[in-house]
Regions:
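Acidic/polar surface patches and capping/hinge elements
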Residues: 1-476
Length: 476
């Protein structure tokens, strides 16, 4: 583990301090870092460890990830010119169905690396070709674009296109994102009950099987899905305690907890955090699949980490293979581009365009002459406005300020993120978060023999005015 960790993190942010921690723990355990022999035939356990580490390192250098080339893309190129988020709109996009890079004054990536004056490249569009852990070739489709192969496991089919038979669903889906960004203000009166009594417990067999079915699954204006929760704790038989919180706090905490941005684990890392939470719970017993003899801590950790890692690796290969092939646009690009074109709901209203954004009263409207957003010379009249999170320009000090929600020009819409990151640098379809999370949740269920957290309840605390980093909060 020491050799592999030292190799894997040698180019990471704060690599020197990370290595110092590895060195300190290795020494504390009584091991000699200067012993580098791989001759395990001598019977040396340390040599065997070094040999296994070198095998893993060598395998990684030829597994298709292009580690030797700093994981750079070998043939993928974006079709769209970069969007400059600090400028209004999205005037230069050429294809509303394809991914668009962002041009940022400074980009701080998911690992905390600062890249000045950068348009970050698509992260992992060729990842479908990485050697998987357990994915089957029977589930593999190999596509070609520009003479290059794109490997796709478990192909879900194409997402809606702006100019295809599902154009209305394309518009609806991205409009939902804009509308749900209106839920990010703790000052509004909306409360949500977030205990297991209300959230979750939706049968996977009842998930929508069509794009059109999403309209019935998600609540467009209020947020949420049809999950019915559980009235009683399956371990104790007692009712779950209700937890009413401001919707704006819950939505912001949820967004930042799962954020792909700097100073955050990526979703696979979150699931290791959840596994550690389970491991450390006083009610948990280490029995593989919940049966048989108790395992010691080391055996359990090796098996659990190995199985979870394999599943998350395959989730990445599958999801990023899909992302690379379908190369789908992200919300900030689509929302701004549609709004630039106008509104697509009513040909009798101003700014009608068939490929514009749909109108939803109270959330997506047209600026009229009496609107505070009309401009000093009415230059914004006829443009699209959104009732949404107002964006980073309303935050001077993230420790004290809250951008809040209000009417803004759609040309200035931002997702809830920091301006040095904005949105993850890869295609929006298919969801990596969902793919990782479903895979990890199923694995934890199989590992522990229980689909619930120990004691039937898992808790995560987001302290008032401390947890959020994009802006101040949560408020309670």
């Amino acid at each position: 583990a020491y050799r592999l960790l030292s190799h894997r993190f040698q180019r990471s942010p704060h690599a020197l301090s990370t290595q110092a921690r590895f060195d300190a723990l290795f020494a504390e355990l009584g091991y000699d870092a200067s012993f580098i022999s791989t001759d395990y035939e001598t019977g040396s356990a340390a040599a065997l460890g070094n040999y296994i580490a070198q095998c893993l390192i060598d395998f990684g250098l030829q597994d298709g990830a292009n580690e030797q080339g700093s994981y750079d893309n070998q043939y993928y190129d974006p079709v769209n010119p970069p969007l400059i988020p600090l400028l209004p709109g999205n005037p230069n996009i050429s294809d509303l169905n394809r991914w668009q890079p962002l041009a940022l004054d400074i980009f701080i990536d998911q690992s905390g690396n600062s890249l000045p004056s950068s348009a970050p490249a698509f992260l992992g569009p060729e990842w479908g070709r990485v050697i998987p852990f357990a994915l089957a070739t029977d589930d593999l489709t190999i596509y070609q674009r520009d003479g290059q192969d794109y490997w796709v496991y478990h192909d879900p089919g194409a997402p809606p296109h702006s100019d295809g038979p599902l154009a209305e669903d394309y518009k609806w889906g991205f409009a939902l994102v804009a509308i749900w960004s209106s839920h990010l203000d703790p000052a509004d009166s909306a409360l949500v009950e977030i205990s297991p009594a209300t959230f979750g417990n939706f049968d996977i067999d009842q998930f929508p099987h069509t794009i059109e079915g999403l309209r019935d699954f998600y609540d467009l204006t209020e947020g949420g899905d049809p999950g019915g929760g559980r009235q009683t704790n399956p371990h104790t038989g007692q009712p779950y305690e209700k937890q009413w919180v401001p919707r704006g706090d819950y939505a912001r905490v949820l967004a930042e907890f799962w954020a792909d941005g700097p100073d955050s684990e990526t979703p696979p890392g979150h699931w290791y955090t959840l596994l550690n939470y389970v491991n450390d719970h006083p009610a948990f017993t280490r029995r593989f699949a919940g049966k048989g003899a108790l395992l010691d801590d080391l055996e359990w950790d090796i098996k659990a980490y190995f199985v979870l890692g394999g599943a998350l690796h395959d989730a990445a290969v599958a999801a990023w293979g899909i992302k690379g092939w379908y190369d789908y646009i992200r919300p900030v690009s689509a929302i701004r581009a549609m709004a630039d074109r106008g509104q697509s709901s009513d040909p009798n209203l101003a700014s009608y365009a068939p490929d514009g954004i749909p109108l939803f009263p109270g959330f997506i409207e047209v600026v009229d002459a009496d609107d505070p957003l009309a401009g000093t010379d009415s230059e914004e009249v006829g443009k699209i406005k959104l009732y949404a999170w107002r964006g980073p320009s309303f935050i001077d000090n993230p420790f004290d300020d809250i951008a809040g929600v209000g009417w803004i020009l759609a040309a200035d819409w931002w997702p809830y993120q920091r301006p040095s990151f904005v949105t993850p640098p890869f295609a929006g379809y298919i969801s990596g978060h969902s793919t990782f999370s479903r895979a990890a949740a199923e694995v934890l269920t199989l590992l522990t023999g229980d689909e619930y957290f120990p004691g039937g309840l898992g808790e995560f605390h987001a302290p008032k005015d401390e947890f959020l980093v994009f802006e101040d909060g949560p408020s309670v």
